[in-house]
Amino acid sequence: MLLRDVKPADLDAYVRMRCDPVMMSELGGPQPRERIAGQLRRDLETVREDSAWIKMVVAGDSAQVAGTVTLYPHEGISEIGWMVLPEFQGRGLAGEAVRQVLDLARADGRWGLIHAFPSTTNAASNAICRSAGFSLIGQEETTFAGRIFQTSHWVFDSSAHA
């Protein structure tokens, strides 16, 4: 598994991840396809500015994108999120990618407390939080892409895990 920064050629992967009803079922449903190119442009700019990390998860020795892990400032906190395409799920890629990003965050030193908000019904993502060393704070309503849903609120102190 390899992590790399998002690049312009990732538009198809963005569409596959964000417009698919199965992929987005735990995030309030699919996003409109016409918004995805703009999202990619904004993400590329954030990576250029180094204000967020948007890492594409590449499976094995192939160049095929399997998913993404993002770490970004959001409403005064550092937030991490991830998704893996259905055909790559169940291989441990998301867990490995999240742990690698947390290792990078520890070394970088600027992220402090890192929050994750998986849907309360997303057993796999909640298990990743647990196994990666996050502490469960509680449950709350979260808005993502204009949709409200119930999430588990996890926190990881990247400075305490140095």
Identify the meaning behind each predicted range.
Residues 93, 110-111, 134:
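Helix N-cap/coil-helix junction residues
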Residues 121, 144:
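Positions that flank functional sites
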Residues 84, 90-105, 123-131:
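Conserved acetyl-CoA-binding loop-helix of GNAT-fold acetyltransferases
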Residues 26-27, 91, 137:
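Residues that scaffold the ATP/ADP-binding catalytic core of kinase and kinase-like folds
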Residues 114-118:
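Conserved hydrophobic beta-strand within the GNAT/NAT acetyltransferase core sheet
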Residues 1-87, 103-104, 108, 113, ...:
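GNAT-family acyltransferases
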